[in-house]
Amino acid sequence: MSNTNGGSVGKCPVMHGGQTSTDKSVMDWWPNALNLDILHQHDSKTNPFGPDFNYKEELKKLDVDALKQDLKDLMTNSQVWWPADWGHYGGLMIRMAWHAAGSYRIADGRGGAATGNQRFAPLNSWPDNANLDKARRLLWPIKRKYGNKLSWADLIILAGNMAYESMGFKTFGFGFGREDIWHPEKDTYWGSEQEWLAPSGAKNSRYSGERDLENPLAAVMMGLIYVNPEGVDGNPDPLKTAQDMRVTFARMAMNDEETVALTAGGHTVGKCHGNGDAANLGPDPEGADVHEQGLGWMNHKTRGIGRDTVTSGLEGAWTTHPTQWDNGYFYLLFKYDWELKKSPAGAWQWEPIDIEEQDKPVDVEDGSKRYNPIMTDADMALKMDPEYRKISERFQQDPAYFEDMFARAWFKLTHRDMGPKSCYLGPDVPSEDLIWQDPTPAGKTDYNVDLVKGKIEASGLSIADLVATAWDSARTYRGSDRRGGANGARIRLAPQKDWQGNEPERLSRVLAVLESIAAEEGCSVADAIVLAGNVGIELAARAAGHDVSVPFAPGRGDASQDMTDVESFEVLEPVADGFRNWLKKDYVVKPEELLLDRAQLMGLTAPEMTVLIGGLRVLGSNYGGSKDGVFTDRVGTLSNDFFVNLTDMAYTWKPAGENQYEIRDRKTDQVKWTATRVDLVFGSNSILRSYAEVYAQDDNQEKFIHDFVAAWTKVMNADRFDLQ
């Protein structure tokens, strides 16, 4: 639209009936309110595809060989608007894929490359992701060509693989299957700092104590993927940087050997860019004006491309031949002594002393010119930290071993958040099962389900035992990286069998019964555990006067201890479970916020979370048999009593200690029930109360049971990727 009013500026033409910009939201006015938005993401209202779209089916139409060739051709098809270094985009594409996958953290499974989230804020505008918008824009013609048959998430990682292969490296494999999201994720906590690259001593720092990094964060600074390339807080000291690397990579699920392999393999090709003044760069993509069309960090003051590009501020390549895979990284690292210098952009970097001319990489535009290679503080850590040095020396002496280790580490980095191997699609999925994939064998489906259910019902186990055991087995599932869940029955293995939240003594007693039944009838223990929960619910519904059959799909397998990486599974241990009204200890975070986080990881909506809480309470499935929140006089009956009594104004609610409340009769002042914050939030939060009122209605008792069974089944089947 053009302004036809002589250039004068008028007042806003709308009466602010809709909030279209960033004026104060409800959460801004009441910042301590429970943010239920994290449960309502990525639904049909933001997804341009209809409910019938199936990415798995679209992938079957993809010509993978043609796609891979197109990507290899792209690598050397330099564009005038963003020229390729040495005529090859490989380094840029690898950095894009690395930074997409490298945002993953093992503590909550969030981040990573499985959703294509690098296209959206904040990741698309992180300082560490500067100029990766150019990489994605270079890929756009390929995305446009293959359309619905290829997600951005898959394309970003495959581009990294093909970049390596086009430079002579053989990758370990590739699995398709990453599905795109369509807006920024609202559930991922990136840190509480108020500025990019805030040092560790700044306000709201992610560090406490000596240098204790806040959970679940992995990166050392807001806006970085892993560590600061100049050193801790920008101060070069390779030994201190080594400690940051060890923490950061461990939180990305990598050990020391994988850390060295990824650092060296990532820096074998490509370069850093800092040949100019960063002050000449424009805003990041989210802050740029509309005419930039989603591109950021544009330099309209100087040339700003090719050899004059500014990205990280460091300037130079790590190796003599930055467009080919070789062992040149370790060759230069150990051949020369290195000294600190400043890049043209003013960043700290390490440069070799008295380097031979033939060891210098050539200029990205003029092959007759040579410049010093560089190392970051992280690179120098591989030489100066004793443990990293041992690994680096072995890699230098055995290039084939290094190549294999890097191939495996790169595959792990780029597939860690995709879930089990059954989620990998396409012709290049490696046949080898890897321990970090949480392998689980297929289970049987040809046994008599009704006979198993009958034996469980006759076993003497209580409804609470049946329901709690099934819930504990399934609740570990997290949609963020598709780990955990009931399949595999790892609740009977270390470390889960000993987790406090699983009530080990009760669990052992119940499992002994279920394992015996499973052995007698030829089903997996995993199936028997889920069936036990279903039986408990059916019995409780029958007690309420409703004949219900809880849906069940056989086929879960039983993992072995050898298939289970104990250390890797320890991060799945719940520290709280509001569904069973349990806290391992008191936390700064409110119990209801911990509940919300758990519900989001499990893939639940707010109504599903609500109905599950109400049902689990009346089934008596609280941790340790606690009576908190059990607002019923008929425990074990699947009734809507929790909601009826929570919303009944015949009662008052009074604090009775830390996270403890009493529900008293208004007339007699007698204590009727006790509760926690998790219970009362369903009456205090206006949104949750609206759901509670629905289930409290006289005409919705049957709806309550129906919705509870549906939500329960969703939880039990969350990790059944074979059914999806």
From Swiss-Prot:
Give UniProt keywords alphabetically.
Answer: Heme, Hydrogen peroxide, Iron, Metal-binding, Oxidoreductase, Peroxidase
Residues engaged in binding heme b: H267
Question: Which superkingdom, per the lineage?
Answer: Bacteria
In chain numbering, cross-link Tryptophyl-tyrosyl-methioninium (Tyr-Met) (with W-98) is at Y226-M252
Q: Which InterPro entries match?
A: Catalase_peroxidase, Haem_peroxidase, Haem_peroxidase_sf, Peroxidases_AS
Q: Does the keyword Transmembrane apply?
A: no
Output the Gene Ontology terms for molecular function.
catalase activity; heme binding; metal ion binding
UniProt catalytic activity: H2O2 + AH2 = A + 2 H2O; 2 H2O2 = O2 + 2 H2O
Record's cofactor remark: Binds 1 heme b (iron(II)-protoporphyrin IX) group per dimer.
A Pfam family assignment: peroxidase
Kindly give the Gene3D superfamilies that the UniProt entry links to this protein. Answer: 1.10.520.10, Peroxidase, domain 2
* The protein's Enzyme Commission number: 1.11.1.21
As for PTM, the annotation reads: Formation of the three residue Trp-Tyr-Met cross-link is important for the catalase, but not the peroxidase activity of the enzyme.
Instruction: Report the SUPFAM superfamilies cross-referenced here.
Output: Heme-dependent peroxidases
Q: Which sites are catalytic?
A: H99
Give the EC class as a word: oxidoreductase
An annotated GO BP = hydrogen peroxide catabolic process
One GO cellular-component annotation of the UniProt record comes to: cytosol
Cofactors (names): heme b
| Family matches, as PANTHER family | CATALASE-PEROXIDASE (PTHR30555:SF6), HYDROPEROXIDASE I, BIFUNCTIONAL CATALASE-PEROXIDASE (PTHR30555)
Q: Which family does it belong to?
A: Belongs to the peroxidase family. Peroxidase/catalase subfamily.
User: What does the UniProt function comment say about this protein?
Assistant: Bifunctional enzyme with both catalase and broad-spectrum peroxidase activity.
Subunit comment for this entry?
A: Homodimer or homotetramer.
Report the NCBIfam families cross-referenced here.
Answer: cat_per_HPI (TIGR00198), PRK15061.1 (NF011635)
| Record-given protein name | Catalase-peroxidase 2
